Each structure stands twice: as structure tokens, then as C-alpha cells.
A protein has these predicted regions:
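N-terminus-centric sequence/structural signature that marks the extreme N-terminus
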Residues: 1-137
Length: 137
């Protein structure tokens, strides 16, 4: 199985933690969940100046400015799509939705076929990407 985490900082933490500190926190949270998903790690920090995507090891953001209001992350045990295309968090093309997911969708091929008939284009073979588009639909 994979591991997922979410962090919603208090108002004070938002003021005290810049993107550099949050990227370090994301790295620590990913490390704590490494036993749940040894194949890949990723996270997304939602700040007032946009979304910062992170990988492991966390890299410093281009801008250290911005207050983070939400941090989502995932450690991955690759089962269905073993390629890097299955890296999470997944983001919808319009940027409206972000998904971290732990589990397996057994009927994802049928769901994917239905969504493709409705014009959705997938970048991976991962069941998690199917879930993202199904929820956005």
C-alpha cells in the first residue's frame, strides 16, 4: 500500500512557515511514510502565490515567499503503472483538482474507457489518474 498525508497549518503556522520550511516538512513526512511506499514520493504545497510541486529529495522552491495553506503528499508502492507517469500528486489539466490516493481501483479499466469516450486524455496507466478524472467529471 501507499502512504498519504495532509497538513493544514494553523493561522500562526501559515505566517511562520515559508515554502522552504514546508518543503523540509514534506521531506520529513515522506520519510516517515517510506515504509508504506518505497517506490516514489511526491507532494504539493498550496500557497498564496501558487502550487509548489515537490519531489524527493525536496528541492528548494524558486521563490521562498508565500504562505502555505495546505500540504498534500504521498509515498508510492508502484503496482499498476510502474513508470514515473504514475507519480503523485496528480493534478487535473485545468489545475482545479489535486489528488493523493491510497488504494487500488479494481474496475479502473472500465472507468477509463468510459472517460476516454467522453474526451478525457490520460498521461499514465495509473488507476489514480482515472480516479482524478472521474471525480472531476
Amino acid at each position: 500500500m501507499c502512504g498519504i498525508f495532509g497538513w493544514v497549518p494553523s493561522r500562526r503556522q501559515r505566517q511562520d512557515n515559508g515554502l522552504v520550511e514546508v518543503s523540509r516538512l514534506a521531506g520529513k513526512l515522506c520519510a516517515a511514510l517510506a515504509h508504506r511506499g518505497p517506490d516514489d514520493r511526491g507532494w504539493a504545497a498550496f500557497a498564496d502565490n501558487g502550487i509548489l510541486l515537490g519531489a524527493e529529495p525536496p528541492r528548494a522552491p524558486a521563490s521562498a515567499e508565500g504562505c502555505v495553506s495546505l500540504l498534500l503528499g504521498q509515498t508510492r508502492l508502484s503496482i499498476i503503472d510502474l513508470s514515473s507517469a504514475g507519480h503523485q500528486p496528480f493534478h487535473s489539466p485545468d489545475g482545479r483538482y489535486t489528488l493523493v490516493y491510497n488504494g487500488e481501483i479494481y474496475n479502473y479499466l472500465e472507468l477509463r474507457a468510459e472517460l476516454e469516450q467522453q474526451g478525457y486524455a490520460f498521461k499514465s496507466r495509473a488507476d489514480s489518474e482515472v480516479l482524478l478524472y472521474a471525480l472531476a467529471h
